[in-house]
């Protein structure tokens, strides 16, 4: 265990940040799952609405430093591709 005062503070900060990041990452996974479920159900309006929410949240998490910009772009692109595949299938 850390002995210096600054090292103890760093341990506390790391725990706090890890917990916060875990919360947002879990939330992001659930939002992505909502989009995939809406696409699977075939409800185009619900899929588009879920995509809007996901897009907003994912970019919000970039500004919070939870994920990196390219990671977010990749996730959003994948979701857009998925929702757009509904248009082609219909």
Curated annotation (Swiss-Prot):
GO terms for molecular function: small ribosomal subunit rRNA binding; structural constituent of ribosome. Pfam families: Ribosomal_S20p. Residues 1-21 are annotated as: Disordered. Keywords: Ribonucleoprotein, Ribosomal protein, RNA-binding, rRNA-binding. The keyword RNA-binding applies. Transmembrane segments: none annotated. One of its GO terms (cellular component) is small ribosomal subunit. InterPro entries: Ribosomal_bS20, Ribosomal_bS20_sf. Coiled coil: none annotated. GO terms for biological process: translation. Binds directly to 16S ribosomal RNA. NCBIfam families: S20. Belongs to the bacterial ribosomal protein bS20 family. This is Small ribosomal subunit protein bS20. It comes from Nitratiruptor sp. (strain SB155-2).
């Amino acid at each position: 265990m850390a002995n210096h005062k600054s090292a103890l503070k760093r341990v506390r900060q790391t725990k706090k940040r890890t917990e916060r990041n875990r919360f947002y990452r879990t939330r992001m996974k659930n939002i992505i799952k909502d989009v995939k479920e809406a696409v699977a159900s075939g409800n185009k309006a619900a899929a588009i609405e879920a995509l809007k929410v996901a897009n907003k949240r994912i970019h919000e998490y970039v500004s919070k430093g939870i994920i990196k910009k390219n990671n977010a772009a990749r996730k959003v692109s994948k979701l857009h591709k998925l929702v757009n595949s509904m248009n082609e299938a219909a």
